[in-house]
């Protein structure tokens, strides 16, 4: 089966899930799947996807896995005790053909946030792997290895010795086996230039650093959970700080557009959080504005970390490193370009939260095509509240 362990997911799912357990245990949510590739027919694979999801829902955390989580400094003991009783419930997820009969599939995940938050990453990995093992039954692994070696060689120059990257590629990987090979190759060829991986399963198996803090769903849910919509970003960051007391201090900057983030990310947050993550829009412009924002708030940018994670490849990593090296701390999360580049067109698939407690939620991405909401009226209202202009 494709998913061997409930740890085969991104670390930020657990860091967010802990906040949900402690602060929002009653929240009810809905997630929806979307494939952005035109003309891709996923309907022939529905039965296989359902079978893999059924297997996922049979998994439990082992004692060794729970001990590993307990050893992470930011994971609290009561959360690990909860995970010892936890399993994913199949009744919360449905996989079916689109009523439009256009080759698209509908995957919806509806239920308590606490009991559905761990579905997204493994379900996406399942869809990806089922699709590629059916469309590419004899993959050209030699080509994948050649491409990977070529990319990693770009980083092995003296002037890039401090350029560090991480694997963020679980959800859109070609296969679990390929992601593992990529990770081990990166460790062998990059050494200390590999910061770690977002995948907790592989981090545990191969003694790597697990990486991650928060995702958009956390900030989106706070639109419904906070006291006032305009204050929901501040509310989310303050609740995060209440949970982690300065640990896991990387804020995600594009849920309401970068202008709104800078308005909310005041002197207090500049000092409190260790840094900020970029996930949409022009990364060069974003980095310049972020460095300037720290300076304007009398915070030395060289003490803060800028993490870039939006559709990166290695040449782009190098460009960003050369632009900002010495001006701030830097980290780069590379996903699909590492874990799904064997010469085939990767699937552009996402699962996004669309409702919380019966209310629509959305993100106003700095890359307009990433915006996903099933209620145009709410999206318009959200833009008005956060002074974000709709894309032309």
UniProtKB/Swiss-Prot annotation:
Keywords assigned by UniProt, alphabetized: Ligase, Phosphoprotein, Pyridine nucleotide biosynthesis
Sites bearing Phosphohistidine, chain numbering: 216
Highest taxon in the source lineage: Bacteria
GO biological process: NAD biosynthetic process via the salvage pathway
Classification via CDD domains: PncB_like (cd01401)
Classification via Pfam families: NAPRTase, NAPRTase_N
Post-translational modification: Transiently phosphorylated on a His residue during the reaction cycle. Phosphorylation strongly increases the affinity for substrates and increases the rate of nicotinate D-ribonucleotide production. Dephosphorylation regenerates the low-affinity form of the enzyme, leading to product release.
Pathway listed: Cofactor biosynthesis; NAD(+) biosynthesis; nicotinate D-ribonucleotide from nicotinate: step 1/1
Reaction it catalyzes: nicotinate + 5-phospho-alpha-D-ribose 1-diphosphate + ATP + H2O = nicotinate beta-D-ribonucleotide + ADP + phosphate + diphosphate
UniProt keyword Ligase, yes or no: yes
UniProt entry tagged with the keyword Ion transport: no
Gene Ontology MF annotations: nicotinate phosphoribosyltransferase activity
Cellular-component GO terms for this entry: cytosol
Enzyme Commission identifier(s): 6.3.4.21
HAMAP family attached to this UniProt entry: NAPRTase
Function description: Catalyzes the synthesis of beta-nicotinate D-ribonucleotide from nicotinate and 5-phospho-D-ribose 1-phosphate at the expense of ATP.
UniProt similarity note: Belongs to the NAPRTase family.
Protein name per UniProt: Nicotinate phosphoribosyltransferase
Provenance organism: Cupriavidus necator (strain ATCC 17699 / DSM 428 / KCTC 22496 / NCIMB 10442 / H16 / Stanier 337) (Ralstonia eutropha)
């Amino acid at each position: 089966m494709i998913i061997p362990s409930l740890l085969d997911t991104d670390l930020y799912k657990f860091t967010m899930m802990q906040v949900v357990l402690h602060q929002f245990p009653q929240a009810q949510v809905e997630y929806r799947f979307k494939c952005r590739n035109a003309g891709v027919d996923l309907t022939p694979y529905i039965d296989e996807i359902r079978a893999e999801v059924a297997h996922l829902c049979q998994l439990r955390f082992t004692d060794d896995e729970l001990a590993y989580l307990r050893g992470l400094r930011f994971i609290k003991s009561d959360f690990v005790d909860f995970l010892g009783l936890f399993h994913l419930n199949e009744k919360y997820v449905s996989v079916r053909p689109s009523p439009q009969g256009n080759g698209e599939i509908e995957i919806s995940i509806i239920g308590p946030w606490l009991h559905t938050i761990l579905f997204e990453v493994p379900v996406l990995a399942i869809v990806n792997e089922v699709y590629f093992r059916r469309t590419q039954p004899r993959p050209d692994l030699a080509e994948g290895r050649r491409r990977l070696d070529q990319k990693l060689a770009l980083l092995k120059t003296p002037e890039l010795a401090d350029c560090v990257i991480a694997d963020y590629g679980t959800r859109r990987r070609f296969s679990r086996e390929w992601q593992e090979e990529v990770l081990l190759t990166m460790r062998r060829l990059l050494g200390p230039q590999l910061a770690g991986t977002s995948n907790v399963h592989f981090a545990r198996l191969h003694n790597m650093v697990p990486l991650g803090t928060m995702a958009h769903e956390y900030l989106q849910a706070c639109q419904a959970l906070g006291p006032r919509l305009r204050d929901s970003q501040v509310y989310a960051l303050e609740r995060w700080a209440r949970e982690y007391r300065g640990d896991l201090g990387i804020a995600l900057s594009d849920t309401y557009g970068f202008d709104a983030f800078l308005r909310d990310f005041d002197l207090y947050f500049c000092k409190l959080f260790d840094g900020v993550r970029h996930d949409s829009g022009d990364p060069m412009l974003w980095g310049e504005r972020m460095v300037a924002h720290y300076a304007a708030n009398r915070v030395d940018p060289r003490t803060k970390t800028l993490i870039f994670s939006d559709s990166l490849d290695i040449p782009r990593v190098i460009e960003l490193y050369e632009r900002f090296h010495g001006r701030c701390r830097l980290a780069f999360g590379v996903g699909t370009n590492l874990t799904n580049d064997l010469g085939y067109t990767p699937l552009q698939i996402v699962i996004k939260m669309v409702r919380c407690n019966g209310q629509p939620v959305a993100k106003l991405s700095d890359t307009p095509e990433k915006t996903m909401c099933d209620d145009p009226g709410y999206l318009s209202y959200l833009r008005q509240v956060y002074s974000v202009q709709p894309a032309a």
